[in-house]
C-alpha cells in the first residue's frame, strides 16, 4: 500500500478535472483518473497514476474503486467532477434530457462515493468534493433551469454524504463555481474567457478544501467570476 494519499478524480481528461489532477500531483498525491479515453497527462508520473476507462453515463464506479484499491491500497479523496449540461428550459425539455443529466451529475457521483465509502472512512479523514455549480444555488436563466435542477440535487448529495460520514472523519464539500474557462462554458456563453474563473483557480480551491483538518469543515464553497447579489 502506498504511504501517499490517493485521490480519485472523474472527468479528469480536460478542463477542471485535469487542473485538479495537476494541482494534487504537485502536492504529492497519488492519482486514479477517470477518463472516457484514458491518456496519461504530461505532468503525471506513471508509477503514481492509475488511469481508469470511465464514463459517468455508463456506470462502473464499483469496478473503478476496486481497481484503484488493487493498485494503491487506499483511497483518501474523491473529486466527482464529471458533469454535463443540456441547455434547455424546464418547459422545453423532455424527460430524456433530465434523465441524462441526473445520470451523470447526481447518480454517478453518489455511486462513486458509495463504492469508496469504506476506504474513505478507514483513513479517518476521507474527503469528498462534489463539483456542483452556482446553478445549484440559484436559477439564473430559463435555459439553465433543467441543469439547475440537477445541480441543486448535487449540492443536496454533498450534504447527504457529509451527514452520513461526518462521524467517520469524512468531510464533503459542494464546490459551486459560476462560469469557468472550459469547453462547456464556451459552448453556452459569449462571455470573454479572460473574464471567467480559470480551471487552475478552481483547482487551488479544491486542494485547499481537501487539505483542511477535520475541525475545519466546509459544507459549500461558492466561486463566482461576476458580481451577483449573494455570490
Q: What are these model-derived regions, one by one?
A:
Residues 13-14:
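Conserved glycine-rich cofactor-binding loop
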Residues 27-43:
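Conserved glycine-rich Rossmann-like NAD(P)H-binding loop of the short-chain dehydrogenase/reductase
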Residues 46-59:
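Rossmann-fold cofactor-recognition segment
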Residues 89-90, 97-102:
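Substrate-binding pocket helix/loop in short-chain dehydrogenase/reductase
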Residues 113, 150:
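Active-site helix of classical SDR
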Residues 133:
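Residue(s) in the substrate-gating loop at a strand-loop-helix junction
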Residues 167-170, 174, 191-231:
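C-terminal helical subdomain
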